[in-house]
Amino acid sequence: FIAFNWHALPRMAKFALAEATLAATVLACLWRGPDTIAGTAALAGAALVTGGLLALVGQTYQTGADTFELFAMWALLILPWALAGRQAPLWLIWLALVNLAAQLWFARWGMRAFAGGNANLWTLFLINAAALAAWEMLRAAGLREFLAPWAQRIVALASGVAATAIGVLAVIDAQTPRWLAALAWLAWLGAIWMAFRVRRVDVFVLAGALLSVIVVVALFLGKYLHADNSFFSPLLIAAAVIALATGGAVTLKRLATEEA
């Protein structure tokens, strides 16, 4: 009913509805407590409704603000809630907003000359690598909102996807400084090894790093061996991928058994 009649609602009615929803979610969080599942869900809902309210302001008054400003303001407004709520889902929402705001900013104003037109990928890599490092340090410090393995693995997944994309750039993109991309990818792999193998073991994160290695190595071999037009090139690439996957799987299985 509301969706069907939304355009017919007066301006003030739209704002009243959005603000009432925001107030209801905040009150629900205070009532149930931010440490409960219901309270966490309510606070996450409040964070999402805040974005809807900002979008409504921009749509109603035609502020002319850039899209990145919406996401940046959204992230700024929910930061106190993330700090006060001390819940992993809130920090994941905040990190997603920071990623979106930074990507949109770099896409319009960013360092295209430095990044070779790949500012978005570099932004993703830098933000999520820094977020994973900060998350691990705060987890080691014992802060409860950073102790949940599933949340850190989501951050690690985002970091791994971005790092793999940087590794791919080191192989195929002539516009990107390849030495810099290769160095960044190798540094990420080294940091993952130190944090999730030497200091403690997380098989999920290590499996993601292994997949990154397989993708980049296979692409590297495919590029330089395919140039020879040799009959054996596909066989060598397949053998390398199988060897990496098999060796990695055996190692990960052994680590999982040791941790069990």
Role assignments for model-derived ranges:
Residues 1-260:
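Alpha-helical multi-pass membrane segments and their bilayer interfacial helix-loop junctions
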